[in-house]
């Protein structure tokens, strides 16, 4: 692994310890991390790291989802690292930009990992996103603002997200992880 990314490598090792059933996925993330110096740049056309937020309410009972304009589906806030190897900071920045919720804070270590294909669009070829997800908690103010990347935003009960077959499998997985963690 390149010596300038040891922090993410250590965070991935910690995640593997906490989620031993995801060894293969963590290994794929580590191989990708070591593959090229530009893995945090969207210009790296094979794929790149992204940071996302599992944005929960102050009481932890609800999650804020966005209906993504380009992908036309409900997702968690998140986006490109744009050269920033500190993916928790990326997740927080994207949550703030995409929701407008004030007083957000990142909690703890990596919460979830997801590797998924992004379809070709315009001059951008199909590519991989290596998405590193963190819990981001709202404070008392849960008011949101819809920006140009979203068609809608909605607070949803985590327990409902876990069982909603119309939602992306990774959202349901994160909801189940959250429910197990907060029983």
Feature locations, PLM:
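Short, low-complexity, intrinsically disordered N-terminal peptides in bacterial proteins
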Residues: 1-7, 180-183
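Generic N-terminal amphipathic, Lys/Arg-enriched alpha-helix
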Residues: 4-16
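Acidic, metal-coordinating catalytic segment for phosphate/diphosphate chemistry
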Residues: 14-52
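N-terminal strand-loop-strand
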Residues: 40-76
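Hydrophobic alpha-helical segments that drive targeting, anchoring, or assembly
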Residues: 54-55, 81-83
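Unchanged
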Residues: 82-170
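Charged phosphate-binding loop/patch that engages nucleotide di/tri-phosphates or the phosphate backbone
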Residues: 166-183
């Amino acid at each position: 692994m390149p010596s300038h990314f040891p922090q993410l490598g250590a965070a991935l090792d910690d995640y593997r310890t906490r989620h031993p059933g995801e060894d293969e996925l963590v290994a794929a993330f580590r191989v990708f991390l070591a593959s090229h110096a530009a893995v945090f740049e969207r210009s790296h056309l094979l794929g790149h790291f992204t940071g996302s937020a599992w944005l929960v309410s102050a009481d932890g009972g609800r999650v804020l989802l966005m209906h993504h304009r380009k992908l036309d589906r409900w997702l968690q806030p998140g986006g490109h690292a744009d050269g920033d190897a500190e993916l928790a900071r990326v997740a927080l920045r994207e949550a703030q930009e995409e929701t407008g919720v004030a007083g957000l804070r990142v909690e703890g270590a990596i919460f979830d990992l997801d590797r998924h294909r992004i379809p070709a669009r315009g001059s951008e070829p199909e590519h991989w996103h290596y998405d590193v997800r963190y819990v981001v908690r709202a404070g008392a103010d849960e008011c949101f603002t819809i920006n140009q990347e979203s068609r809608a935003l909605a607070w949803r009960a985590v327990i409902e997200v876990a069982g909603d077959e119309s939602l992306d499998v990774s959202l349901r997985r994160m909801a189940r992880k959250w429910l197990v963690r907060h029983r």
